Amino acid sequence: MPHSDELDAGNVLAVENLNIAFMQDQQKIAAVRNLSFSLQRGETLAIVGESGSGKSVTALALMRLLEQAGGLVQCDKMLLQRRSREVIELSEQSAAQMRHVRGADMAMIFQEPMTSLNPVFTVGEQIAESIRLHQNASREEAMVEAKRMLDQVRIPEAQTILSRYPHQLSGGMRQRVMIAMALSCRPAVLIADEPTTALDVTIQAQILQLIKVLQKEMSMGVIFITHDMGVVAEIADRVLVMYQGEAVETGTVEQIFHAPQHPYTRALLAAVPQLGAMKGLDYPRRFPLISLEHPAKQEPPIEQKTVVDGEPVLRVRNLVTRFPLRSGLLNRVTREVHAVEKVSFDLWPGETLSLVGESGSGKSTTGRALLRLVESQGGEIIFNGQRIDTLSPGKLQALRRDIQFIFQDPYASLDPRQTIGDSIIEPLCVHGLLPGKDAAARVAWLLERVGLLPEHAWRYPHEFSGGQRQRICIARALALNPKVIIADEAVSALDVSIRGQIINLLLDLQRDFGIAYLFISHDMAVVERISHRVAVMYLGQIVEIGPRRAVFENPQHPYTRKLLAAVPVAEPSRQRPQRVLLSDDLPSNIHLRGEEVAAVLLQCVGPGHYVAQPQSEYAFMRR
């Protein structure tokens, strides 16, 4: 039923008095209360707030995806202007009608790409399906358009990626596939739920610009859900701040950043990590914690030395990891992905070494290879003087008690059939460390340390927000008191307050127990805050490594400078200058089988600071 006379001129979406609740233990728990907002054509509305504040469930309610999950949604008005200019009341649409609205008129980019993509279909089939459904295109036309969309989101070897499955792509590449799928039908409204969380800063900058270009081209309204205030400053026209299910402040991006009125908004802004805040400091520094009573009370920097002199706890030499690509009638291996190429580094007890680089640079593969989650084709991995890359599976399991992994995708790494208490207890049971009663107490302590409640132990993963699920994964990794923790984008899904709490927790544990961290991240501001040393990876190789202060304050390699220049600044008046990003040529790390790539040769430019020699920078900055 049309409602064209009820939607104000210029608006493409209007929501009035939205209330969302869930039933728990026969009680109605409110998730969103009395939320009202509108969205104009060509406008970007950023919805910000802490994990569990109601941001994502608001988006799911607009897409009518909460009913199947048991959500109770009530709304006085939820109007959408379709691409055809017809105005509809979303709450009145049948399930069949909503299938035509989703994708064509209103699309959503979800936070966790691995759980949003179908594992049994190729990337090309999934993008083409939406194009064929909403644009009446043939299969051939849809695949051509799918390839064009992958090119637009700057995926290298786009034609090859079309035939890949989601598990064969990195987290950042999967997110780019999701973005390509959402934008393929040119919707009237795009809802982006943390769309750049899994992306490195350079790809994030390119995706933000791509969304801006398509938004201008199609007069598309964008609802941008994020916890990254730097992204908000760069892309938003208006900002809606949510706290505990309610809108506490709304205004233009300049008003929110320069004259915030609500104490929570002021605390949120003050807690944002700023690149360059560590200038002149040698050691990691704690984050300020969000407090409504004392907004952004800064804790003193950690100046004690946590790195222990002596032998490294982990030593990696010339690590090589490659993945085969099959083709042809006989399905033979003809090419290989050179994911990691002759990588070497040491990790000392009590040290945090951060691996940074673009999506597909080999950061995550390096971390997984250290635990033999992927097999390496060369090199040595030595832990506490023992070579572990040749250990039998039985001996390797005992070793994993001392080396724990925090994965990038929290939902995919938790068993949906287990309560989170059982998931945290499981490693304790596998290694026979604690009896049942003591294990339960340990779980309660761990949940409290990561900002959750002991009673949460009886809930299941789907009952938590993305940020809460990541905290659960961190609690599980800490259960065994490991000597080394490999954290793969461990805090990228967390809002600034919880991220600060988790980083502070990791620093406390490092100080108390001498834990060494291999911190894999694309968030340069967090890396600057937590790291003792930083290694920059590009196309599977380390091109710069050194003390954090030297790498950030005096970057030598052009790629390192490029990464730092791409970091969004949480200041609307200091947006990055417009750059041509959409037609850049992205080099590929796929080579013919048997083809060898010249090794990067590092030269010393300062105490502990090494940079790739110019002759080995083979077209690093072609773009």
UniProtKB/Swiss-Prot annotation:
Its main location: membrane. GO terms for molecular function: ATP binding; ATP hydrolysis activity. One of its GO terms (cellular component) is plasma membrane. It holds the Pfam family oligo_HPY. It is an enzyme of class 7 (translocase). CDD domains: ABC_NikE_OppD_transporters (cd03257). ATP binds at residues 49-56, 357-364. GO terms for biological process: peptide transport; transmembrane transport. Transmembrane segments: none annotated. Its EC number is 7.4.2.10. PANTHER family: GLUTATHIONE IMPORT ATP-BINDING PROTEIN GSIA, TRANSPORT ATP-BINDING PROTEIN. The complex is composed of two ATP-binding proteins (GsiA), two transmembrane proteins (GsiC and GsiD) and a solute-binding protein (GsiB). Part of the ABC transporter complex GsiABCD involved in glutathione import. Responsible for energy coupling to the transport system. This is Glutathione import ATP-binding protein GsiA. The gene is gsiA.
